[in-house]
């Protein structure tokens, strides 16, 4: 895993070269879909996230960690840009942290960092705020089309993404009256994908993973 300690003090060019050097592993697949966890895949067209395309996902860390765990456990490589407080402890339990590149502080050009990562990884997650105009998005999307990554924006709005996924934690599992510890989470998920009717369901991560489609 690449973190702040390796990027500290490096110029933008040096950061890019370091990131490029860590992307020599083969991609998970050349198919057009990055398979999602089965319980989420039931709601998504063809069971996963579109490669060479953008998906917007709500700011739900538990769902993002589940995506990272599933992708790395299947042999894929993941990049996370601009999310220093995201805990990857769950990935070490179910996935493979050695297949994760983390750039907590991408500096003034997070899209430039993401553009490097989408050329060689399977899943790239960018967390920021605001709306991304077509002009600003164009260079990144050009790089995305040249690779095979699925690009996920968290907290960023972009015109016409392949899918928008809303996610809200609805239940904490394992906690009784005044005691216990969290062993799992129920997440209500809503998916709106191009060319498909909206889908929603409740996904449990942690102790038990299942989906009750609505």
Predicted regions and their residues:
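Short, charged, surface-exposed secondary-structure boundary motifs
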Residues: 110-114, 162-163, 177
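Hydrophobic/aromatic beta-strand patches that form the interior of the parallel beta-sheet core
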Residues: 55, 79, 101-103, 152, ...
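C-terminal functional extensions of proteins
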Residues: 169-214
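Long, charge-dense
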Residues: 77-141
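Glycine-rich, charge-decorated loop segments at or immediately adjacent to ligand/cofactor-binding or catalytic sites
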Residues: 88-92, 157-171
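Detector for small/aliphatic-rich hydrophobic stretches
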Residues: 1-80, 194, 214
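Short glycine-/polar-rich loops that comprise or flank the Walker A/P-loop
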Residues: 76, 97, 120-121, 147-150, ...
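Long, charge-dense, solvent-exposed interaction surfaces that engage phosphate-rich ligands
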Residues: 132-136, 141-143, 148-163
């Amino acid at each position: 895993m690449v973190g702040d300690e390796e990027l500290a003090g490096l110029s933008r060019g040096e950061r890019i070269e370091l990131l490029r050097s860590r992307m020599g592993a083969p991609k998970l697949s050349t198919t057009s879909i990055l398979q999602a966890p089965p319980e989420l895949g039931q709601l998504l067209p063809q069971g996963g996230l579109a490669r060479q395309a953008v998906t917007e996902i709500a700011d739900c860390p538990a769902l993002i960690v589940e995506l990272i765990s599933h992708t790395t456990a299947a042999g894929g490589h993941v990049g996370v840009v601009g999310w220093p407080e995201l805990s990857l402890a769950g990935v070490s339990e179910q996935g493979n942290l050695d297949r994760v590149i983390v750039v907590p502080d991408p500096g003034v050009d997070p899209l430039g960092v993401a553009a490097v990562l989408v050329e060689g990884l399977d899943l790239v997650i960018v967390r920021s705020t605001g709306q991304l105009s077509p002009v600003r998005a164009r260079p990144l999307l050009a790089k995305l089309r040249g690779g095979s990554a699925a690009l996920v924006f968290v907290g960023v709005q972009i015109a016409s993404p392949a899918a928008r996924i809303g996610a809200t934690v609805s239940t904490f599992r394992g906690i009784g009256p005044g005691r216990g510890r969290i062993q799992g989470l129920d997440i209500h998920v809503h998916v709106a994908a191009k060319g498909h009717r909206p889908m929603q369901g409740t996904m449990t991560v942690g102790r038990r993973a299942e989906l009750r489609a609505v």
